[in-house]
Amino acid sequence: MPKFIFMTVLILALMASCSWLLAISADVEEIDIVVPKSNQVGPLSREEVRRIFMSEKSSWPGGKHITVLMFAPGQRERAIVLRDLFKMNEADYTKYFLQAASTGRLQAPPKDLPSAAQVKARLAANPNAIGYLNKQDVDDSVRVVLKLP
């Protein structure tokens, strides 16, 4: 009987750990960093994208000002980008931009938008913009310059 109980507990523990792993893997989504189709910038490195989104780089080659588009705070895509690209949470990100603004290093903060449709609309309206979308929201109106994670 004790062997049966041990095996039952072991099987239940394995089942629980498998469901936990499935829940974690569901959290891993591919986020694509995108620019308008008309923007001819080549593929970008993670570091280049990080510098652009952190307002450390503010213009494309040729001098055109970069407009950074972010999902609004609380959105899943934003949390993934903050975690995977910046290694920050929302509080750290906010603190970074408050400090940058107070020291004069910040030329223009990213524009927070509520949805993928709004990001795509802004990208369509501004050839110098950069943003991100969940892979499933990417269509032929944008060009992917980096895939996360």
Residue spans of the language-model regions?
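Bacterial N-terminal signal peptides
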Residues: T8-S19
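Flexible loop/hinge segments at secondary-structure junctions
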Residues: I24-P149
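Bacterial N-terminal signal peptides that target proteins for export
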Residues: M1-V9
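Intrinsically disordered, low-complexity and often Lys/Arg-enriched segments
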Residues: P2, L21-L22
